[in-house]
């Protein structure tokens, strides 16, 4: 409706796509978004739609690999544009990491999903030969990896009680 009021504008395009035209059909959920248009990363469109997609179509906790399948669907759409793909990878990685940090049950799935995104898409070949994640994304992913339980944390400095750096 707003797209009709403001045809051809960024505002109209983004607002008109905030909700899927096919909210209950997983393989059509993102069909109304033009993933080749990298301007979609400058709004809350993708984070909102990705989160709603996970909530609606991951079937978690009933399906052990529901989130993995959902990640793959999102990346199949996103990989048509390198910047959009990178935005989606980081958005999902950050979302799962932060969910894991606040999960009172300490469910290991959140860390496993971070590993899946890093191993399959950021450091792996999940996007094919056309998408090469930037050094910045690889560095951020490495920082996520270093913060996981069992990993060697990065070097850091703190002040002792005498205010000396240790």
Language model features: what each stretch is:
Residues 166:
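Short active-site neighborhood of thiol/selenol oxidoreductases, capturing the structured segment around
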Residues 1-161:
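Oxidative protein folding and maturation machinery
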């Amino acid at each position: 409706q707003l797209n009709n009021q403001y045809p051809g504008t960024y505002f109209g395009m983004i607002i008109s796509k905030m909700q899927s035209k096919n909210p209950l059909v997983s393989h059509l959920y993102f069909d109304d978004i033009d993933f080749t248009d990298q301007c979609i990363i400058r709004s809350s469109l993708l984070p909102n739609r990705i989160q709603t997609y996970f909530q609606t179509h991951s079937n978690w906790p009933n399906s052990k690999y529901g989130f993995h399948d959902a990640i793959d669907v999102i990346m199949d759409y996103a990989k048509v544009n390198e910047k959009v793909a990178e935005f989606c990878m980081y958005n999902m990685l950050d979302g799962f990491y932060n969910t894991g940090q606040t999960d009172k049950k300490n469910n290991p799935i959140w860390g496993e999903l971070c590993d899946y995104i890093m191993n399959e898409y950021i450091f792996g070949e999940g996007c094919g030969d056309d998408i090469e994640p930037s050094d910045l994304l690889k560095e951020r992913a490495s920082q996520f990896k270093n913060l996981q339980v069992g990993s060697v944390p990065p070097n850091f400095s703190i002040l002792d009680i005498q205010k000396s750096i240790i």
